[in-house]
């Protein structure tokens, strides 16, 4: 596979402490520059609507970087300035699933993406 024009997006499962909530994310993705990626995060074992779901990422050799978050019951997301206009975070209360979509992908977006509560 030619990796020159493709970037790897890896997502990882995270387990919340409160109420033994488990967050399960969608799998790894390979995307072309300029395209977008949408990652899902399904919660189980606790109340979904009332607690904030945050999205963070970790690029190779770097620390964690907060991208944004949402409280499902309110429906309005907050974003880090760096990602304004490129990231969209949503939540579907009916399926207890949060989503993070990142558009206009660049090589610098190669990272492990996590949802957390």
From Swiss-Prot:
This is Immunoglobulin heavy variable 1-69D. Residues 70-77 are annotated as: Complementarity-determining-2. Residues 53-69 are annotated as: Framework-2. V region of the variable domain of immunoglobulin heavy chains that participates in the antigen recognition. Immunoglobulins, also known as antibodies, are membrane-bound or secreted glycoproteins produced by B lymphocytes. In the recognition phase of humoral immunity, the membrane-bound immunoglobulins serve as receptors which, upon binding of a specific antigen, trigger the clonal expansion and differentiation of B lymphocytes into immunoglobulins-secreting plasma cells. Residues 1-19 form the signal peptide. Residues 20-44 are annotated as: Framework-1. Residues 78-115 are annotated as: Framework-3. GO terms for cellular component: extracellular region; immunoglobulin complex; plasma membrane. GO terms for molecular function: antigen binding. Residues 116-117 are annotated as: Complementarity-determining-3. The modification Pyrrolidone carboxylic acid is found at residue 20. InterPro entries: Ig-like_dom, Ig-like_dom_sf, Ig-like_fold, Ig_V-set, IgHV. Keywords: Adaptive immunity, Cell membrane, Disulfide bond, Immunity, Immunoglobulin, Immunoglobulin domain, Membrane, Pyrrolidone carboxylic acid, Secreted, Signal. Residues 45-52 are annotated as: Complementarity-determining-1. Immunoglobulins are composed of two identical heavy chains and two identical light chains; disulfide-linked. It is found in: Secreted; Cell membrane. Residues 20-117 form the Ig-like domain. Disulfide bonds join 41-115.
């Amino acid at each position: 596979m030619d990796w020159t024009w493709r970037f790897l997006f890896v997502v990882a499962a995270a387990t919340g402490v409160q109420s033994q909530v488990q967050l399960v994310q969608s799998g790894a993705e390979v995307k072309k520059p300029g395209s977008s990626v949408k990652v899902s995060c399904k919660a189980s074992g606790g109340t979904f609507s009332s607690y904030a779901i945050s999205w963070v990422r970790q690029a190779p050799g770097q620390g964690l970087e907060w991208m944004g978050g949402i409280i499902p019951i309110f429906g309005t997301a907050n974003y880090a300035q760096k990602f304004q206009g490129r990231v969209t975070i949503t939540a579907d209360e009916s399926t207890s699933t949060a989503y993070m979509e990142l558009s206009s992908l660049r090589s610098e977006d190669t990272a492990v993406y996590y949802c957390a509560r």
